[in-house]
Amino acid sequence: MYSTFSANFDTTIDASRDRSATPVTAPRPKRNQVARACDWCRLNRVRCDDKQPCQNCQNRGGSCSNTKPQEATSLPAANREMQRLRNKVKDLQDQIAKLKEGAEIQAQTGFATPPLSDAAHTSFDFAELTNTTEGWQGLQQTGQIHYGPLSSSYFVSRISRYLSQALNEPIEDAKLEACMARFHYIAPSHQPSRWDASPASQADQPQDGTEEAEDLTRSQEEHFLNLLWQSFHCVYPILDEREFQQYYESLWSSSPDGMSTRKPSALVDVLLAVCMQYSSTFFVSDDNQQGDTDSEWQAKHANLASRTYYQRAQRLLQSELENPTIMVVQSHIYSIVYLYNTSLLNTAHINLGATLRIAHALRLHIRPLDGTSPEQQELQRRIWWALYRIDSQLSMTLGRPPLIQLSHVSCGLPGDDREHARLSGTVLLTNHEDISWLSFHVQCTKLIFLVQGVQTAFNRKCSQLLNGDKVKDLYEDPRLLETLAEFLGQEMTAIHNWVQNVPQSLCNPRKGGSDPFSTNRDALNLSAYSPLWLQRQRLLLELHYHHLVISTLRPFIRFPPVSSSMTPLTDGYNISCLNHAMAITSILNQVLSETDLLRGWSPIFQYQWDAILCTLGFVLANSVCPPTPSARKSLQTAIRTLDLVSDHFLAAKNAAQVVREVSCQADRLVKNVQQGLTRRQAPRASQALSTRAQNPRQASNQTSFVAPAQPGVRSNSLKRALPPTTLEVSQHQPMPNFEARMQLMDMMPIGSLSELSPSLGTTESMSMPSVTSADMVIGTEAQWLHASAMILDSWTTNS
């Protein structure tokens, strides 16, 4: 044992000596470790790495389990995964914050955010430059100004075509106009002034002293400007009243000849033009039966002077285009208001395009810079969103694309609380805590934004259904129109929400206790104790709402309506559109008869005219229909309303006469229906009586409806006049088919039709139809039509 131990000991010593003699090498580097090797590397017991896929799997060209999402199997791995998710959430929150900052109006209204522009995409597809997909363009003719299918002009063209075909008259004889002011249109002419751009331009003008507008004294100008602050300023709050008063004072104090003349100012001139145009309606006396009275001469002189001041302002603005200021934008906005009140809509739309470019140059569409005073920030916001309101209103009226794209806008909505009202520079006090004088502007902006979104979605849906076919018309396919009606019902929810959220102090109370913005035509409870500006804002907001709904639902009126029961939603929208039109007529008739709140307010005349066109269209398309008598009564009320304003709005008198003439044409269509029934009444009645005499038992076992006649015998005029309805099948008695009801109409007396569609000649004939005659003509469909109207309008009447 000792020998063995000694031998091993010697060997150990020798080995240690050998190791000490050899040089010491560096320790091997520690290999990189991974939390978990991939499945292939772990199976083959080879090193793996953190790459995805790992290097081994990438070299062999196989799949690697590292590319799949890994679950955290240890605490460090879980911490790393949590940190990665935190970073991702932070990035997403930053993106959301940028979107909210760029489109604050979407967050406040809750409507869908408009799509981003193509410039935001990183990849470009040049196929989009040759995209020929178009939506519903309607029936257009070359060489004419384009008006979209949702515009009043296009609706007038549809009515004119239908009357031409139904009465076999040339379409050139149609007397309807899309704009009521065109019934008394006077082309503007140039009026020379000492403030023209150059002396040479003055020499070219006719030197007629009667056409030269006299310069007003300071007291006369202030007399007109005082009308501004409780009228247009409450609707378009784009001025700071304190700043304007200081600016106006400087124009007189710094004039060359002291205080006798004022320095040239485009803003003051255009404000004087708008106020003179507005005040021209106040010169008319009560007794104007003796021709051209002194008051009428004063009104014409005021209109002429307003036109002169407008033209002078435009010449002054031309010299300021290269270096514009906020005041230039304000001047252009009131120029557009002047043109809109004169019903020069195309001119106003073109002027708006230049105004928006000036606003872009002044960066009004972008969030105000830091360091700008709160007063100026709010003023810039109010100016920009006033431009947005005007752009949307003109674009929807003319049926053209809007000029403002909200994807490029980062200017938030202005405030409307008491603090923002204090910053505005205007003192208009009210006892209501939930509103200020700026609330009307904010609510109008939200409403127009929502309606424009609904109409944009409607056009997009039309484009999808038509697939770019420019020739195909929506009215050729009733099922396609019904699909659009179903789609529109979903989009109208946003407008319903707006109605529910309007501040109560901005709503008009009703005498019958019904809800504001309803269509039941209850009389308004006009409060004499509310401020004048607040009463006017309430009326204009509700009228504006009804007018926008009319423009949205108007395309569903068809000429002539289909005689099948395929389109219940479309038919319901016809009645709903009629209800909103009659609501406008009822409100305007009451307000203009009892008060002077809207006297001289030109836009309301266009609201009334669009309501008349909608009502006329419904009567022409549905000569025999339960709501038709109410529609014809509403036409009589509208004529009386036009007569009320004809003393100071000359076009109203001619427009009322045109309504009477078109109503007579509607009577002719009803007479055609009656004549068609007269020709078929006697032979079919005798045939039915002989049939019952031959088969008394069979007749007694059947219902009271006679057997259907041949389809080809039906009168075309009757088929055109009957309304589109649905069939309600009773659980206790089988519903007769369409042919059976047509034969029943042939058996009924002709006098019942006059009850359903009375003549417009006298007011006494406007009595509501009896239940018996309505049920005889339309059966249970009358109940459906009334129910549809209540269902579709329930979102405006229920709180």
UniProtKB/Swiss-Prot annotation:
Pfam families reported in the protein's UniProt record: Fungal_trans, Zn_clus
Biotech applications: Patulin was originally used as an antibiotic and specifically trialed to be used against the common cold, but it is no longer used for that purpose since it has been shown to induce immunological, neurological and gastrointestinal effects. Genotoxic effects of patulin with dose-dependent increase in DNA strand breaks in brain, liver and kidneys have been detected in mice. However, more recently, it has been proposed that patulin might also have anti-tumor properties.
GO terms for cellular component: nucleus
Pathway, per record: Mycotoxin biosynthesis; patulin biosynthesis
Segments of skewed composition (Polar residues): 199-208, 687-705
Record-level GO BP terms: DNA-templated transcription; positive regulation of patulin biosynthetic process; positive regulation of transcription from RNA polymerase II promoter by galactose
Xref: InterPro entries: Fungal_SecMet_Regulators (IPR051127), Transcription_factor_dom_fun (IPR007219), Zn2-C6_fun-type_DNA-bd_sf (IPR036864), Zn2Cys6_DnaBD (IPR001138)
Record carries keyword Repressor: no
Protein's UniProt keywords contain Transcription regulation: yes
Superkingdom classification of source: Eukaryota
Disordered as annotated region, ranges: 190-217, 675-718
Keywords for this protein: DNA-binding, Metal-binding, Nucleus, Transcription, Transcription regulation, Zinc
PANTHER family given in the database record: REGULATORY PROTEIN GAL4, TRANSCRIPTION FACTOR ASQA
Name listed for the protein in its UniProt record: Patulin cluster transcription factor patL
Gene name linked to the record: patL
